[in-house]
């Protein structure tokens, strides 16, 4: 964890990502990438010389079988405010639009919902648990399923 925190700190400093008094939202899906991002930023704020806060946000998209109670417990342990937002993404994509290749529409709806939530909460910075492999995967999925190149 120390190595990861060192890398996160260096990245934040090199790119001047956090200013004094910022609130950084973390988009939390419940997957390992977003949870590591949340934990890293929550721990970083304890020793980082520039004061900032962390706020976790989960979009509850209506996907069957999803439960975020463990995320809520983790946020309490980390002393991080947690907002869960109900958005009808699953219903729109599968019931209304009946998409056969839902990835692009789902991603757009989630991004739009997340941006709206950030605006409503007055938060101007967000951290997502995406990495280079995610970008490659998205590029290949778009190429194979939609016949276009894009991320």
Model-assigned labels for residue ranges:
Residues 1-149:
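ATP-dependent adenylation/nucleotidyltransferase module used to activate substrates
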